[in-house]
């Protein structure tokens, strides 16, 4: 039971980090989190409980590392509120993936210009 409580607290902290400047979304995320806990409160088998705890921990990790809130500025651009735990990639995997996609990769139309054009 302590692992469930620990995962729940961890998820609550994750919602606070991810949605700290957006109170309606923070409240909605916490309502969703509580509902998920209630829905799984009837689990009896230890493997099912461990799987649910692992899933909750993964959700918390995803929220902290991958969710970035943005604010639209007066000039129409968005200011992104990154924090110290935000996962920042180097785009190398994206470049590799595009090369490996072969014929599935989209073709650039004549009306679409890239930064290199």
From Swiss-Prot:
Signal peptide: none annotated. GO terms for biological process: mitochondrial respiratory chain complex III assembly. Residues 98-117 are annotated as: Disordered. InterPro entries: Complex1_LYR_LYRM7, MZM1/LYRM7. One of its GO terms (cellular component) is mitochondrial matrix. Assembly factor required for Rieske Fe-S protein RIP1 incorporation into the cytochrome b-c1 (CIII) complex. Functions as a chaperone, binding to this subunit within the mitochondrial matrix and stabilizing it prior to its translocation and insertion into the late CIII dimeric intermediate within the mitochondrial inner membrane. Modulates the mitochondrial matrix zinc pool. This is Mitochondrial zinc maintenance protein 1, mitochondrial.
